[in-house]
Design a protein with these regions (language model features):
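Conserved phosphate-binding loops in nucleotide/dinucleotide-binding enzymes
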Residues: 6-9, 52-108, 122-133, 252-254, ...
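Short, surface-exposed recognition loops and adjoining beta-strand edges that mediate ligand/DNA contacts
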Residues: 36-46
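Active-site palm subdomain of RNA-directed nucleic acid polymerases
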Residues: 29
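Short glycine/proline-rich turn/loop motifs
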Residues: 1-5
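Short, conserved secondary-structure transition motifs
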Residues: 44-54, 222
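NTP/phosphate- and nucleic-acid-binding module
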Residues: 155-156, 260-318
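Helix-rich, typically C-terminal accessory recognition domains appended to large enzymatic cores
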Residues: 13, 18, 22, 32-38, ...
Length: 318
């Protein structure tokens, strides 16, 4: 004692926290040890929620028993179903999703990825079929790197900037894990993958740096999707286990850095730090691969790109 970090839902605050603090202080007062608090840190995670359903008999209906027939929601017996509130998953309201069904359909890694990527861990997470399907699609996209690795050959190698971007992404993954901002770590992994894909499509990445990139990717994926991480690690020819590798601490090329404000229609949405020497094309590529910016311009038409060197990128969309 004390425990470094207590992680638990707010519903346990009375039983677990109150009693443990009471006994700690009682034992302190009795002279058994000199300790005021049993936990150094406290983190309360959010709940997993799901939409609720009720049929015309006022009975709760499980999500998997609901289907759309001619534009009307019905249960398995054909009775019309009404959509209720989004609430914490509970057996009483039958708004639960069987983990075995998810694992059998998508795999455990997909479930982990979706739950860690969709919202900050201190907030509630709404479970959706579209969300889990999108995560599954990304898992397959990650494994495609193994096939690309086997057949890849570079053209004109020019990958210094790419590697520096990837190093920065790796370091950001680490920073966000340490502060429990797992969704931000996931966003940086998306960014890593997008940058790597662009380099491969342009064939500017050397074979050695492709190997380096996939090794780093496998390691930072390990806390999120451990099974897929090992598959990628093995797929590029490693005969060890990825989980036994040391966590990467990347040294960034110590060139001058500048902060760039990214605007959409004149409104600042993100601020990033980049190498001062990066040319306009490289800056715009980095901006367009930023996950937050991609979400903001999704389904919109890009009209114009304005770049004020070392200061601002403004994307005009409609």
């Amino acid at each position: 004692l004390p425990v470094d970090q207590y992680i638990g839902g707010i519903e346990h605050a009375i039983l677990h926290l109150l009693y443990s603090r009471f006994f700690t202080k009682a034992l302190r007062d009795l002279g058994y040890f000199n300790l005021n608090e049993p936990f150094n840190g406290l983190f309360t995670q959010g709940m997993v929620t799901h939409v609720t359903y009720k049929n015309k008999k006022n009975e709760w209906v499980e999500p998997k028993e609901v289907e759309e027939v001619d534009g009307v929601l019905k249960d398995m017996s054909g009775i019309s179903v009404d959509i209720g509130k989004i609430e914490k998953m509970s057996k009483s309201k039958r708004n639960v999703v069987d983990p075995n069904d998810i694992i059998n359909s998508y795999g455990a890694d997909t479930a982990r990825w979706f739950m860690l990527s969709d919202s900050p861990p201190e907030r509630d997470l709404q479970w959706t079929d579209t969300g889990i399907a999108a995560s599954f699609k990304f898992m397959n996209k990650l494994y495609e790197f193994v096939d690309r690795y086997k057949s890849y050959s570079p053209d004109k190698i020019n990958d210094h900037e790419t590697i520096e971007f990837l190093k920065m992404a790796v370091n950001k993954v680490t920073e966000n894990i340490e502060t429990f901002q797992f969704n931000k770590s996931v966003a940086k992994i998306y960014e890593f993958v997008n940058i790597l894909n662009e380099a491969l499509n342009s064939r500017i990445l050397s074979r050695d740096n492709f190997t380096w990139s996939l090794k780093k990717l496998s390691i930072v994926l390990q806390p999120f999707v451990p099974h897929l991480s090992e598959e990628i690690w093995s797929g590029i020819g490693s005969d060890t286990l990825c989980i036994n590798e040391s966590w990467p601490e990347e040294k960034i090329d110590k060139r001058a850095k500048v902060k760039i404000a990214i605007q959409i229609n004149g409104k600042t949405k993100e601020v990033i730090e980049i190498d001062e020497s990066i040319k306009k094309e490289g800056v715009l590529d980095l901006v367009k691969n930023n996950e937050k910016i991609k979400r903001n311009i999704k389904d919109k038409k890009l009209i114009r790109e304005i770049y004020v060197q070392g200061k601002i990128v403004n994307l005009v969309v409609k």
